[in-house]
């Protein structure tokens, strides 16, 4: 599988990684999916301390044991579970980040993290203190690089200006083009986008009938059911016999500001289908422009 450089770092990630949030709570099934992902050539695995109270990190750690040097491992920090585990609070403080990284290392059974990401953030945060925590962890060799997982324009702008982040993880797909607003700035700063949700919750897949029906009850982002139906009909007219899943993935990867897409997978079959779709030929410039002309290009209205 082809790789791309993550920002200006020394990390090279496969164009398709595995978003591990969808692995579930069955250790056996989670391990099987991760093992299959490695066998299929994936080297990029994204988890978080928040997922299933840390259980997700434990599964990833067990599955990657003995294969650590083959893998680019990323996890996230900033959300603190309550003692009752019935909710969480936001904590971007230096003390919390430097304490919680030790817990992630323990669960992941590793002594370093390739990419440590702030899992959210607001403009009211003590941003300089947060950056200082990540920079100290880099100097200590506990993390190799750091990034943020955020959709907030004001937060992205501040970290791009004030820190050494190498990536911004955000939801991005043909139906959610809001991150494209940030392509020029992030490209100029040599900061990559990691795209989660490239298949738009299954709407941009070849088996999407049930997913589309759900939009009748509740819109998808700013798309009404009728708008979505018409947009997908136009997409299919452009791509002909090509896979919709593959087209969705190639759309995200067309601009190389995007280092990788990280769709989730809750089964081996789903993983295999995604990897197969990722092998579809690249979109031509003409196809890319045509797709852009028929899909909305909204921007984030809040947190400017």
Q: Language-model segments: which ranges?
A:
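Alpha-helix N-cap and loop-to-helix initiation/capping positions
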Residues: 29-32, 59, 88-99, 125-129, ...
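N-terminal binding-site loop/beta-alpha segment at the start of enzyme catalytic domains
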Residues: 1-71
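Short, acidic/polar
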Residues: 25-37, 92-108, 150-158
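Solvent-exposed, non-membrane alpha-helical residues enriched in polar/charged side chains
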Residues: 35, 61, 65, 98, ...
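Beta/alpha (TIM)-barrel catalytic core signal, keyed to glycine-rich beta->alpha loops juxtaposed to Asp/Glu
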Residues: 121, 125-303
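Active-site groove signature of glycoside hydrolases
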Residues: 105-124
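A short acidic, helix-capping loop that chelates divalent metal ions and anchors anionic groups
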Residues: 80-87
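Short, well-ordered coil/turn segments that N-cap beta-strands
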Residues: 11-16, 41-44, 67-71, 110-114, ...
